[in-house]
Structure formats: structure tokens, C-alpha cells
Amino acid sequence: MSWRSESIWIEFITGSRKTSNFCWAFILFLGSLGFLLVGTSSYLGRNVISLFPSQQIIFFPQGIVMSFYGIAGLFISCYLWCTILWNVGSGYDLFDRKEGIVRIFRWGFPGKSRRIFLRFFMKDIQSIRIEVKEGVSARRVLYMEIRGQGAIPLIRTDENFTTREIEQKAAELAYFLRVPIEVF
């Protein structure tokens, strides 16, 4: 989603609150809870929940391994739910031609650098760079090349844009910023 006027362009960035993250966190939570319940049932020698039969599972080594997988899965699920709660990675890119400033804001993990705020002058922007890697794990990323700072990604690497969409976005942004486009 973006908002544009003659001199200002604001590009809103979706963070970790995506449908796929909700689905993975929920599936991982339920699966790891099931593993932990089966491991606990094999330790106790009786069914904690009748949905998960544990008579055939011996506690050593299968029950221990299932309990370990269940605990590890719960930790990973907790991590995913925390990133969703904190909306890590969300923010905005603001390009202001009137002031000649580019502002990039992202939410990070809680702590010292929770708010990530970058500010550049437009005159320091060298180019808009497109990096396309085709194949099994295709990757299309849009970068802003800053003099003395290197390349800053403007689009998340896990967003599945087509090559045409990336090129269109790069062309519009390069036209707005009045900088060239580089393709790698």
C-alpha cells in the first residue's frame, strides 16, 4: 500500500502480521503441543488426552524425543507469536522531494533498537537497484543505493512480486527520485 502526491511518496511496509505467519504459528503450536502431550503420556504410562494414544510409545527413547520436539516447537511458536505481536519489520518509506529527504522507519524487536529510523538526503541516492535471481527459489529485491552507505533493501525478500511488478515499482520510484536504475 502506498500514498503519493506531487512531492511526497509514502510506501507502507507490511511486517510480520501476514496470514502465512498466523497460519504457521498456529500449526506449529498445535503440532508441538501434540508432540509434548504424547511424550508426557508415555512418561506417565496413561493417556492424558484420549485423542493421542501412547501405549505403543516407550518413554525411552521415543517419548523423550517427542517431548523434546514438543518443547522446541513451543519455543519456536512462541517466537513467531511474539514477532506477530510486536509486528517486527513493519514501517514505512517516506520520500519527500520538497525537503529532499528520505526517511525509512521499521519496527524491530523490543530493546535498545526497537525503532529503526534511517534518514538520507535525496542527493546521496545514487540509484535504484533491482536484483533478480531466478530458479527454484526465485528472489527479486529492490534496493536503494546510497553514497557511502551501500544498498538498503526497500522490499522484503519474502514478498513474491513478479519481475514485471518489481520493474514497474523500480521505474516509478526512480522517476520520482530522478535517479537511474541498475539491474543485477
Curated annotation (Swiss-Prot):
It is a multi-pass membrane protein. Belongs to the Ycf4 family. Pfam families: Ycf4. The keyword Nucleotide-binding does not apply. This is Photosystem I assembly protein Ycf4. GO terms for cellular component: chloroplast; chloroplast thylakoid membrane; photosystem I. The chain crosses the membrane at residues 21-43, 58-80. It comes from the Eukaryota. GO terms for molecular function: mRNA binding; unfolded protein binding. Seems to be required for the assembly of the photosystem I complex.
